[in-house]
From Swiss-Prot:
GO terms for biological process: RNA processing. Its main location: cytoplasm. This is RNA 3'-terminal phosphate cyclase. Keywords: ATP-binding, Cytoplasm, Ligase, Nucleotide-binding. HAMAP family: RTC. ATP binds at residues 101, 282-285. It comes from the Archaea.
Length: 337
């Protein structure tokens, strides 16, 4: 059984999520201890527990310690269940997108349909529009297709969002994403839930004003939803090049003007573009697991503590070589084979 110290590196939920994904894919059981030991609320929290439950349902796993507050978990996966529907409710505003990142690599070509309820647009995780505009589009470039249906949005603290992910199929193989290529267009989605529509327009216009200096077409749509459980706003942007995509997002909050939200996302996007990387900071971390499974190389915008931690966890499950050139917190090249 693979032994994992949950306090290693950045010591957060990413260690658990990466372990769960690779355990289900490889069939290798693991024991993780000191779960989130250095965090203010150590042990498994509800959204981490739902990642465990989701992967348990997918793989008919045996578990011990899967309860809120637990600092140790044993996870023994069995064969992945195909042709099945799974419902996951991470509660209030638990991150839907972190659950997507955990389960998606494990359900490729398994005909699994997953309904996830919780927070679609919440702090400290990619927004659902980033997942749609950037994450899924880059996966398409490496041979993985997935259908994502956003039924309801959920913001902090009430949540209430709902997403269905299905038809995750493909024939992924080793990939090379070493440049963005010529920038062709910037796409985006500016949204509001149960707030005035002009907020989405102001976010969009603010971002557009800053991005206009890039000299490419800009297509930002607005998504205005009334009657949602939670109130909130945000914007996600995708700079689409001939070979890759760079993304950014920003969320509204009480006291934060709509113009600031749009400006923030635009400046984050430009900062990522200025690194001359092939993928942004979010994707630098998220792409590593796919490169580890299929072989790949890419240039990430920033070598984060998440990335370092991921490397060590991945090597516990897979017999691979990870060659990384670059220093924190700057851009880096990852080659995994």
């Amino acid at each position: 059984m693979i032994e994992i110290d949950g306090s290693f590196g950045e010591g957060g939920g990413q260690i658990l999520r990466t372990s769960l994904t690779l355990s289900v894919i490889t069939g290798k059981p693991f024991r993780i201890f000191n779960i989130r030991a250095n965090r203010p609320n150590p042990g498994l929290q509800r959204q981490h527990l739902w990642a465990v439950k989701a992967m348990k349902m997918i793989s008919n796993a045996e578990t011990k310690g899967d309860e809120v507050g637990s600092k140790e978990l044993i996870f023994v996966p069995h064969e992945i269940k195909g042709n099945t529907n799974i419902d996951i409710d991470v509660g209030t505003a638990g991150s839907v997108t972190l659950i997507i990142q955990t389960v998606l690599p494990a359900i490729i070509n398994k005909n699994v349909r997953i309904r996830i309820k919780g927070g679609t647009d919440v702090p400290k995780s990619p927004t659902i529009d980033y997942i749609r505009l950037v994450y899924l589009e880059i996966l398409r470039k490496i041979g993985i297709e997935a259908k994502l249906n956003l039924i309801k949005r959920g913001h902090y603290p009430e949540g209430g969002g709902e997403v269905i992910i299905e038809n995750v199929n493909g024939n992924p193989s080793a990939f090379s994403l070493l440049e963005l290529g010529k920038l062709t267009i910037i796409k985006g989605i500016s949204h509001v839930s149960s707030l005035p529509a002009h907020i989405a327009e102001r976010q969009m216009n603010s971002a557009r004003e800053i991005l206009s200096k890039l000299g490419v077409p800009i297509e930002i749509e607005t998504d205005v939803r009334q009657g949602e459980v939670s109130k909130g706003s945000g914007i996600a942007l995708a700079a689409i090049g001939e070979k890759s995509i760079i993304g950014a997002d920003s969320l509204g909050e009480r006291g934060k003007r709509a113009e600031i939200v749009g400006e923030e996302a635009a400046r984050i996007l430009i900062n990522n573009l200025n690194t001359k990387a092939s993928v942004d900071i979010h994707m630098s971390d998220m792409l590593m697991i796919f490169a580890s499974l299929y072989g790949g190389e890419y240039i990430g915008a920033e070598l984060t503590s998440h990335a370092y931690t991921n490397m060590e966890i991945i090597k516990k499950f897979l017999d691979i070589k990870i060659d990384v050139s670059g220093k924190r917190p700057f851009r880096f090249k990852a080659k995994i084979f």
